[in-house]
């Protein structure tokens, strides 16, 4: 999403605001051109919202002052409203994955739930899915309890609880806890594959298959 592309590089808040607004419009225009060139039923657009997710934790002393949600509110309809209805659009709420580590560890899923409720209800078009990360060591009720506060209608939820380190068994353990608060969801890796060691990709894919089987097992 726009702030994730801009805010790391412009540390003066005034500069960041000016560039963000221009970049947001440019990104929306680029997405429209993609939609003109690619058959709509072959296209899925996933907004990667990293800065938008971690900025609330006040990690960066150059982050603009004020309510971060106000900035998210300004960009949310602009980037998605012009996308044709036939195109699938979703959000990945990201805490970063450099060196297999987050910028900050999420306390629980409350921030992801808050952001999900906001983007689904304020994008000006249908949002088909949201993705939320789950650290490997979180199989406690406190992490998943905020899922009860989701207000996103029929939007799909994917929990990034699949990790190659503990495979399908670890995913199943986390699934069982999450289902106490959200009975139906899909599963995914915690973040993208782009920075992974290639040797870990096949074990992670196998873990996905085993986790998916766990979802369909009573």
Residue ranges and their predicted role:
Residues 1-5, 47-52, 92-97, 134, ...:
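Short loop/turn segments at strand-loop or loop-helix junctions that form parts
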Residues 1-72:
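Active-site-proximal, glycine-rich beta->alpha crossover segments in alpha/beta enzymes
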Residues 11-14, 102-106, 197-201:
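Short, solvent-exposed loop/turn segments at secondary-structure boundaries
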Residues 18-31, 65-79, 106-118, 140-147, ...:
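Well-ordered, non-membrane alpha-helical segments in soluble/globular domains
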Residues 30-43, 74-89, 118-128, 181-182, ...:
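A structural motif corresponding to the C-terminal end of an alpha-helix
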Residues 55, 99, 196-197:
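Active-site-proximal flexible loops/turns
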Residues 70-154:
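Aromatic-lined glycan-binding groove of carbohydrate-active enzymes
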Residues 120-218:
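Catalytic-face loop-and-helix region of soluble metabolic enzyme cores
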């Amino acid at each position: 999403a726009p702030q994730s592309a801009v805010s790391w590089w412009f540390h003066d808040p005034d500069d960041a605001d000016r560039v963000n607004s221009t970049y947001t419009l440019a990104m929306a225009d680029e997405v429209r051109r993609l939609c003109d060139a690619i058959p709509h039923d072959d296209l899925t657009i996933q907004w990667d919202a990293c800065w938008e997710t971690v900025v609330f934790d006040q990690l960066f002393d150059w982050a603009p002052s004020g309510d971060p949600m106000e900035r998210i509110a300004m960009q949310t309809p602009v980037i998605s409203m012009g996308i044709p209805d036939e195109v699938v659009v979703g959000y990945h709420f990201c805490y970063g994955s450099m060196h297999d580590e987050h910028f900050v560890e999420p306390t629980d899923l409350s921030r992801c739930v808050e952001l999900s409720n906001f983007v689904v209800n304020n994008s000006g078009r249908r949002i088909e899915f949201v993705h939320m990360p789950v650290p490997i060591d979180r199989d406690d009720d406190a992490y998943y309890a905020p899922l009860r506060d989701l207000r996103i209608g029929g939007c799909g939820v994917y929990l990034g609880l699949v990790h190659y380190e503990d495979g399908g068994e670890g995913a199943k353990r986390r699934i069982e806890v999450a289902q106490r608060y959200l009975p139906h969801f899909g599963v995914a890796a915690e973040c993208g594959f782009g920075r992974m060691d290639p040797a870990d990709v096949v074990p992670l894919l196998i873990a996905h298959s085993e986790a998916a089987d766990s979802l369909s097992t009573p």
